[in-house]
């Protein structure tokens, strides 16, 4: 595959791959390698006048590295490199693109433990979850490698032997803007469909979790992708705005909060750019009295405490039918108290640290506000200090279950994005449907019941894009993920995502003479 020439300003340090020093526990790693990546290599901005800000390890609260943020010149360099890569990549057949993607998936599997450890160190989630996130990233790339080989259009026969056909074509340079809760997975979920369709991508991770996206960039390059196919630029709001407003960018895909999503949509509209928005949620989980209680409790825990509760699709409004509330609460509180909190790099840990001190404080304030508004704390909701002294400054809290919640409480109306479960009671199906849909958000919803007719009837009437029956937070890459209402536009994963990373061209072919009115 032809390599494109890339010019870097003098003083930039370039290298393709830096092996990480492996660590056995939290608090032992310092990252000194550059975290920006374009022109097929890491880019050091130390000789460029650019901002630098600290990145913290959530498990210990110590500084993990310093982030060099990208300004206008750096963003432009990355986009220009992506534009050059696009011209090469779009001309390859679907099979040729698939080979590169499958090799990237193989390299991810080979480096699974290393990537998972880096995700834990930068994000704070448990190593058990991080491994599953890396697996999801790999599976998404494998899935869309298959889609790359089957991209096709439609043939339409017209009168007189004439015909028309359609063809799917890439946009060009796509921008991906990731969230801090699934850094590596989101980078893969956004890049896989983009490059399968023949696009290139410039990806901006959250400044809180900048470390692992650059590993994916290295992996794509090692797999045989042209330099510039997947680039990483670091920074915050200013860098994101530069990307969204860049005239050479044709598509923006964002995962994050509703307010930021609205700003991105507004910026993209100035250039009439396509957007995919995966935004917030305040999702309902409905548990009927005929449910298998054991599975319902498991589902409620999965719907609230994965990744320390920092999951946009979490079912944080848990509606439980009145007759089974005592049994449900007894069991869910018992299991919540038993959740192992501590060093996220230890296999026995089930809940690690929240992503930042500011976010931890915000979640704890929500718990205090819930108590002030009349909710009852059945367990948790307090700062937690693990026994290991090196973790004393980490961002930990005990998972919280709130009872006596009502629909008008702040904890029920606003997305907390932490390990806080709000339990509400209901009596009838019609009542719970009305209350469950009383939200501007519609990302996800779930129902637990043994009545198959009721299950499908309730799901049909729930205003949410990603729904679950007798399970929760299951996101196989083969099926689309995304929301209704203010929770977003477009979908991640599944075959339909191809439509959000490509544009349709119609070609009409005349086989006879031209009829003219003139």
UniProtKB/Swiss-Prot annotation:
GO cellular component: cytosol
InterPro entries xref list: Ald_DH/histidinol_DH, Ald_DH_C, Ald_DH_CS_CYS, Ald_DH_CS_GLU, Ald_DH_N, Aldehyde_DH_dom
Example GO BP: protein homotetramerization
Any GO molecular function: aminobutyraldehyde dehydrogenase (NAD+) activity
Keyword Isomerase: no
PROSITE patterns recorded: ALDEHYDE_DEHYDR_CYS, ALDEHYDE_DEHYDR_GLU
Main localization, broad class: cytoplasm
Keyword Transmembrane: no
Superkingdom as given in the UniProt entry: Eukaryota
Catalytic activity line of the entry: 4-(trimethylamino)butanal + NAD(+) + H2O = 4-(trimethylamino)butanoate + NADH + 2 H(+); an aldehyde + NAD(+) + H2O = a carboxylate + NADH + 2 H(+)
Protein function: Converts gamma-trimethylaminobutyraldehyde into gamma-butyrobetaine with high efficiency (in vitro). Can catalyze the irreversible oxidation of a broad range of aldehydes to the corresponding acids in an NAD-dependent reaction, but with low efficiency.
Name of the molecule in the record: 4-trimethylaminobutyraldehyde dehydrogenase B
Taxonomic source organism: Danio rerio
This protein's encoding gene: aldh9a1b
């Amino acid at each position: 595959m032809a390599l494109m020439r890339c010019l870097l300003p003098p003083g930039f340090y370039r290298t393709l791959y830096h092996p990480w020093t492996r660590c056995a526990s939290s608090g032992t790693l310092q990252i000194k390698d550059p975290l920006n990546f374009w022109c097929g290599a890491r880019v050091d901005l130390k000789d460029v006048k650019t901002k630098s800000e600290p990145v913290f390890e959530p498990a210990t609260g110590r500084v993990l590295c310093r982030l060099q943020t990208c300004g206008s010149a750096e963003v432009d360099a990355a986009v220009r490199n992506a534009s050059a890569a696009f011209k090469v990549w779009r001309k390859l057949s679907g099979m040729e693109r698939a080979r590169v993607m499958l090799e990237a998936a193989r390299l991810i599997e080979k480096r699974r433990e290393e990537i998972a450890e880096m995700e834990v160190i930068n994000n704070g989630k448990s190593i058990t979850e991080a491994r599953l996130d890396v697996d999801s990233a790999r599976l998404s790339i494998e899935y869309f490698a298959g889609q790359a080989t089957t991209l096709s259009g439609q043939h339409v026969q017209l009168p007189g032997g004439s015909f028309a056909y359609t063809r799917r074509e890439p946009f060009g340079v796509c921008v991906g803007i990731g969230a801090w809760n699934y850094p590596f997975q989101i980078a893969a979920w956004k890049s896989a469909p983009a490059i399968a369709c023949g696009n290139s991508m410039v990806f901006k991770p959250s400044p809180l979790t900048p470390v692992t996206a650059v590993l994916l960039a290295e992996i794509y390059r090692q797999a045989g992708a042209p330099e510039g196919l997947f680039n990483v630029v670091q920074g915050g709001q200013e860098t994101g705005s530069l990307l969204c407003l860049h005239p050479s960018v044709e598509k923006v895909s964002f995962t994050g909060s509703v307010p930021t999503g609205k700003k991105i949509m507004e910026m993209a509209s100035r250039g009439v750019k396509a957007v995919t928005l995966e935004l917030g949620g305040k999702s309902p989980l409905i548990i009927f009295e005929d449910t298998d209680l054991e599975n319902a409790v498991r589902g409620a825990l999965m719907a609230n405490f994965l990744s320390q509760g920092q999951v946009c699709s979490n079912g944080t409004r848990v509606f439980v039918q009145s007759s089974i509330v005592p049994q449900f609460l007894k069991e869910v509180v018992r299991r919540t108290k038993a959740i192992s909190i501590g060093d996220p790099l230890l296999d026995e840990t089930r809940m690690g640290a929240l992503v930042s001190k500011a976010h931890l404080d915000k979640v704890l304030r929500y718990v205090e506000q819930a108590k002030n508004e009349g909710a009852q704390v059945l367990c948790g909701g307090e700062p937690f200090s693990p026994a290991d002294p090196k973790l004393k400054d980490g961002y930990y809290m005990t998972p919280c279950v709130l009872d006596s919640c009502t629909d008008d409480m702040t904890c029920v109306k606003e997305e907390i994005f932490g390990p806080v479960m709000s339990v509400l009671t209901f009596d009838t199906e019609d009542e719970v449907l009305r209350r469950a849909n009383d939200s501007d958000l519609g990302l996800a919803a779930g129902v637990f019941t043994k009545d198959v007719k009721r299950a499908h009837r309730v799901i049909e009437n729930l205003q949410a894009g990603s729904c679950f029956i007798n399970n929760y937070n299951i996101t196989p890459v083969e099926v689309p993920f995304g929301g209704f209402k203010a929770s977003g536009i477009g979908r991640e994963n599944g075959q339909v995502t191809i439509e959000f990373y490509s544009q349709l061209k119609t070609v009409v072919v005349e086989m006879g003479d031209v009829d003219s009115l003139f």
